[in-house]
């Protein structure tokens, strides 16, 4: 059975403070072979750096989430750039636009999204894009920055299959997690049916977005088999075919040889 690559997790989150070491020590024995722990704020990026040093199978992504961009300065941007170049840092992220909340203002978010896209281009690493209620501006800024030359993943994909075509044409991957198992996720299921299997990677976004039957509880990489089962059903292929494709795609996404 092909191992699982969780392409997007937040084990640095406070939700794991009580049992983090115990949980992370157990994952490899449960078929979770690789995890990318993803930064969201400057503080969480520091924790990501610690985790990727501490565990062989954990890699990092360093970047500032749109909701945290108000804290960015030229000085902290320079620090980000330095950390992103570490060997075990596989991507710049998570970066993007989030218009669900009123703050930070859209111009601040756009400014730092573009700057972090430029950073990824400069250091030749892919990006992990967070986009919520901001499809048009995300596409426009990615087009402006020639994101097709940078590459990366649209994490926790939540838009239509029509929007998926635009990201596919840019050569991006799609991160799919627990939401796929939700009864009300009709739009996502249609998008996953449409997106070719060679463009899909698995993720948790843990501790958030646990799949059914654990919806509402703390998520972890151990829940990915529920997502695999849902995807196999939608795609009309076996669970092993989903595992194998997702593993191979994850290696390509993050420029890993094996």
Question: What is the role of each PLM region?
Answer:
Residues 1-258:
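Mid-domain alpha/beta scaffold segments of enzyme catalytic cores
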């Amino acid at each position: 059975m092909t191992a699982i690559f969780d392409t997007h997790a937040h084990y640095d989150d406070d939700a794991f403070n009580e049992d983090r070491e115990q949980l992370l020590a157990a994952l490899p024995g449960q078929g979770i072979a690789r995890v990318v722990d993803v930064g969201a704020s400057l503080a969480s990026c520091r924790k990501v750096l610690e985790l990727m040093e501490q565990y062989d199978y954990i890699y990092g992504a360093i970047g500032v989430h749109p909701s945290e961009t108000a804290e960015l300065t030229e000085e902290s941007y320079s620090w980000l750039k330095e950390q992103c170049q570490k060997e075990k840092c596989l991507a710049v992220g998570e970066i993007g636009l989030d218009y669900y909340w009123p703050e930070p203002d859209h111009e601040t978010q756009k400014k730092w999204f573009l700057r972090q896209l430029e950073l990824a281009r400069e250091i030749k690493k892919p990006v992990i894009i967070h986009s919520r209620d901001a499809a048009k501006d995300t596409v426009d800024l990615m087009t402006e920055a020639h994101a097709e030359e940078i590459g990366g993943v649209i994490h926790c994909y939540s838009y239509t299959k029509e929007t998926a075509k635009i990201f596919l044409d840019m050569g991006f991957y799609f991160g799919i997690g627990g939401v796929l198992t939700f009864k009300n996720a009709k739009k996502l299921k249609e998008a996953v049916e449409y997106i070719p299997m060679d463009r899909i990677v698995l993720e948790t976004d843990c501790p958030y977005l646990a799949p059914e039957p654990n919806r509402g509880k703390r998520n972890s990489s151990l829940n990915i088999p529920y997502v695999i089962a849902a995807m196999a059903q939608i795609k009309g292929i076996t669970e092993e075919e989903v595992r194998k494709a997702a593993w191979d795609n994850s290696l390509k996404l993050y420029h890993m040889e094996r």
